[in-house]
Swiss-Prot record:
PANTHER family linked to this entry: RGD1565685 PROTEIN
Chain segments carrying region Disordered: 299-320
Protein name: Uncharacterized protein CXorf38 homolog
Entry annotated with the keyword Phosphoprotein: yes
Modified residues (Phosphothreonine): 315
Length: 320
């Protein structure tokens, strides 16, 4: 771990703001996990109480025919059809996109989390609980399920900020943006004044966003760490872990966008070049992201080959 590389990165105010905002989202995710876990269980119990026939003794009869694909799901048995109806009844976006591909419908009678994933963004099929999800997945669940009684405008404002963080090609945000983000995330947290673990993170986020991180590069005989004006010490490895987690989430987001063809190949290529250039200049970060980077590059290469092949088919052969 190279302290001087970290100091150089945080010497860029806009990158430091990006890391601060991302760190807030990590804190938000952590404080929401227990609350979400309890509420998902409560929601599932409520569904079973309202429609007892959907309970643990109900069995999917459709087998593989009841397997959803992305946003498409046509149940082939009565149990899955009734579950789909109940999920849509509680879905705020019931007439829009529902990512059924996240779910294993056969588990809906017994597994509350499989039901919850129908209210979340794409790409979560392998997630087994809130502890494995990022902030936007948990925020989307709160926003999309009518079990959660909140001001949804406040939720969508934070989701929008998160997307701006992850879609920032150069991983930078301005101080003005950060102040606006602080207002929006605090407005959201104020919706949960009766949830102790969420209340507890409010002051931590406030301190984090209003302090000016002062990086201390220690001498050889000093302890290996970075001193912050908030009065606590974060080791180089802790800051490194925060950066890695944010960059990993960014690469995973880019992968999903590429897989769903939500971005043009040249846009993916440009963003990929920026990230590779950044990691090339920051070797202390690069090693922790090799697998995610290779996965994205491999998918991008497949798309490029397919695009070239399609273009070749469309080009008429010249006559000799």
């Amino acid at each position: 771990m190279v302290v001087s590389e970290l100091a150089a990165r945080l010497n860029c105010a806009e990158y430091k703001n990006w890391v601060k905002a991302g760190h807030c989202l990590l804190l938000l995710r952590s404080c929401l996990q227990g609350f979400i876990d309890r509420e998902v269980l409560s929601f599932h119990r409520g569904l079973l109480a309202a429609v007892p026939g959907l309970g643990p003794h109900a069995t999917c009869r459709g087998g593989s025919r009841c397997s959803p694909r992305a946003r498409q799901f046509q149940p082939q048995c009565q149990v899955c059809a009734e579950w789909k109806h109940e999920i849509l009844r509680h879905h705020i976006n019931r007439n829009g996109d529902v990512h059924w591909g996240n779910c294993k419908p056969g588990l809906w009678p017994k597994d509350p989390w499989e039901v919850a994933k129908a209210f979340m963004p794409r790409g979560l099929a392998d997630k087994r609980g809130p502890e494995e999800c990022d902030a936007v997945a948990l925020l989307s669940l709160i926003n999309s399920c009518d079990h959660f009684v909140v001001d949804r405008k406040k939720v969508t404002e934070v989701i929008k900020c998160r997307n701006e963080i992850m879609h920032s090609s150069e991983m930078k945000v301005s101080s003005t943006w950060l102040r606006d983000f602080q207002i929006k995330i605090q407005n959201f947290l104020n919706e949960f004044k009766n949830i102790p673990e969420i209340v507890a993170v409010y002051s931590r986020i406030e301190q984090l966003l209003t302090s000016d991180w002062a990086v201390h590069i220690p001498e050889e005989d000093e302890r290996d760490g970075c001193e912050f004006e908030i009065g606590s010490y974060l080791s180089v490895s802790q800051i490194h872990e925060i950066e890695i987690e944010l960059l990993k989430e960014k690469l995973q987001e880019m992968y999903l966008q590429a897989a769903e063809e939500e971005m043009l190949p040249e846009e993916i290529s440009n963003q990929l070049d920026v990230v590779k250039g950044f990691l090339g200049s920051n070797t202390d970060l690069r090693n922790g992201l090799t697998e995610d980077l290779q996965k994205l590059e491999s998918l991008h290469l497949q798309h490029q080959k397919q695009t070239s092949k399609d273009a070749g088919r469309q080009t008429p052969e010249r006559k000799a």
